[in-house]
From Swiss-Prot:
<keyword id="KW-0597">Phosphoprotein</keyword>
<keyword id="KW-0964">Secreted</keyword>
<feature type="site" description="Reactive bond">
    <location>
        <begin position="377"/>
        <end position="378"/>
    </location>
</feature>
<feature type="glycosylation site" description="N-linked (GlcNAc...) asparagine">
    <location>
        <position position="265"/>
    </location>
</feature>
<feature type="glycosylation site" description="N-linked (GlcNAc...) asparagine">
    <location>
        <position position="101"/>
    </location>
</feature>
<feature type="modified residue" description="Phosphoserine">
    <location>
        <position position="378"/>
    </location>
</feature>
<keyword id="KW-0325">Glycoprotein</keyword>
<dbReference type="InterPro" id="IPR023796">
    <property type="entry name" value="Serpin_dom"/>
</dbReference>
<comment type="function">
    <text>Inhibitor of serine proteases. The primary target is elastase, but also has a moderate affinity for plasmin and thrombin.</text>
</comment>
<protein>
    <recommendedName>
        <fullName>Alpha-1-antiproteinase</fullName>
    </recommendedName>
</protein>
<feature type="modified residue" description="Phosphoserine">
    <location>
        <position position="33"/>
    </location>
</feature>
<feature type="glycosylation site" description="N-linked (GlcNAc...) asparagine">
    <location>
        <position position="64"/>
    </location>
</feature>
<keyword id="KW-0646">Protease inhibitor</keyword>
<keyword id="KW-0732">Signal</keyword>
<comment type="subunit">
    <text>Interacts with CELA2A. Interacts with ERGIC3 and LMAN1/ERGIC53. Interacts with PRSS1/Trypsin.</text>
</comment>
<dbReference type="GO" id="GO:0004867">
    <property type="term" value="F:serine-type endopeptidase inhibitor activity"/>
</dbReference>
<dbReference type="GO" id="GO:0043434">
    <property type="term" value="P:response to peptide hormone"/>
</dbReference>
Amino acid sequence: MTPSISWRLLLLAGLCCLVPSYLAEDVQETDTSQKDQSPASHEMATNLGDFAFSLYRELVHQSNTSNIFFSPVSIATAFALLSLGSKGDTQTQILEGLQFNLTQTSEADIHKVFQHLLQTLNRPDSELQLSTGNGLFVNNDLKLVEKFLEEAKNHYQSEVFSVNFAKSEEARKMINDFVEKGTQGKIVDAVKDLDEDTVFALANYIFFQGKWKTPFDPEHTTEADFHVNESTTVRVPMMNLMRMLDVHYCSTLSSWVLMMDYLGNATAVFLLPDDGKMQHLEQTLNKELISKFLLNRHRSLAEIHFPRLSISGSYNLKALMAPLGITRVFNNGADLSGITEENAPLRLSKAVHKAVLTIDERGTEAAATTIVEAVFMSLPPILHFNHPFVFTIVETHTQTPLFVGKVVDPTRK
């Protein structure tokens, strides 16, 4: 008989931030030509790419008039870690919802590729600050399954903290301090409140700080119009740059594509749709196209006008993950018996994701030939990012999508 007591688990999936960084005058570029070509890394990048754009389209479906910003790799890491302690249909839903084909990839291999990915992302880089972290907050009288703890530490580099959830304010502060420290103070007060029967919390964060290889000159930034929609226009600081840049027009997406590298191993891909083509861009964009853009680069003289911006995203993942098939972990049928040795069932009561982004002149702070067409003109192309656009930030060694976003209104944080 199922016990009448039900304990709750809080998942803080992907608390992430991107923040701008001042340019270092004496920084030398790192050789990023040696991409991580291992099959595991390629599979992970493909799965995360599919997951990223599935999640993006669901966010657009929920609201196509708001800024969007999230970290697919951070959300996926949190749920993959949770799957370590799940069983049966609960585990299957999580892993298939993350776009893994369980007939081709074993559970053990999935956790190994996450381990490899996290080791790659946390690799020291003097030019690019990129770090991730996982924290397990366990009620001090709750006994966890030793195998779950060992694998969480081994595969996901998790830290474990003993917490008295009966003192909810102290527990909330401990979780918030962990996130605030991991994001270097950019995300504070991540947890607003805790359910009274919470006994376990999992927090994942990602922090990214990058400097543009080709920075904007602040002296060239001017006030300009940004057209939110046909009836709304806002004034924004518009950064201006004319250089040799990776710019081309993609007829498949009816969009201009701008790729801007960071010092280190990351690239931002900005997609500016033609008038009236945003919906077409969002329905057509996929991981394969992003990969082709990164492999078929076309540097040419171009002039760009790009808004200085600071946006954020905060999401209830329970509603967001349901269309991807991840539902059982949130209800009373959840099987998370691989986490705790206690008899009372555990279920995920709340899963939240928060991300913040700043792009300015210095950089970002928080994160087939027939398809890609290069347009050659006698005059350099001029790109005005003065209406809604889509972007992704990719770790170039693995082509992992770190962040995905949409700017509808740069003035709305």
